[in-house]
């Protein structure tokens, strides 16, 4: 591993670790970790603060994934390192040192990574995940479905091995991060889209 690659990985992790949801909520006088699901992500911001702040957070979180991959490319690193930098950004988002190694579930940041690695895969996954979310009214169901769609498509599309490995890892991590949501969906206690925190 070269010093450049090591620097890119570290910077990617730190970019991903920027807790946009937590910091924006704090500026509004809210501790996002103590309301709703306690998750530092756009969905919890939507329920706690509304559409505008949620859109800002989602956009920033997507950008984190995009920037990590572009950083590796700008530094002249290979496609393998670019994919790994994307993964590190999502890990940073999910396990941020700024939030005692807690964070979000990585949906938006994973989308940013996948979209920059393979725009067709990213767009297809996004459209189908949004459709699932709209039909079920569950954000978590759309996110989980998106993970399965991305994982399935990357296995059949002609993609480099490292891109394929990165997408499969991100899909598996996203499903794991939603394990509590899966339990709530099974129990019928998951909040639907549009429900405010009590």
From Swiss-Prot:
Keywords: Cell membrane, Lipid biosynthesis, Lipid metabolism, Membrane, Phospholipid biosynthesis, Phospholipid metabolism, Transferase, Transmembrane, Transmembrane helix. One of its GO terms (cellular component) is plasma membrane. The gene is plsY1. This is Glycerol-3-phosphate acyltransferase 1. Belongs to the PlsY family. It is found in: Cell membrane. The lineage of its organism: Bacteria, Thermotogati, Deinococcota, Deinococci, Deinococcales. One of its GO terms (molecular function) is acyl-phosphate glycerol-3-phosphate acyltransferase activity. Catalyzes the transfer of an acyl group from acyl-phosphate (acyl-PO(4)) to glycerol-3-phosphate (G3P) to form lysophosphatidic acid (LPA). This enzyme utilizes acyl-phosphate as fatty acyl donor, but not acyl-CoA or acyl-ACP.
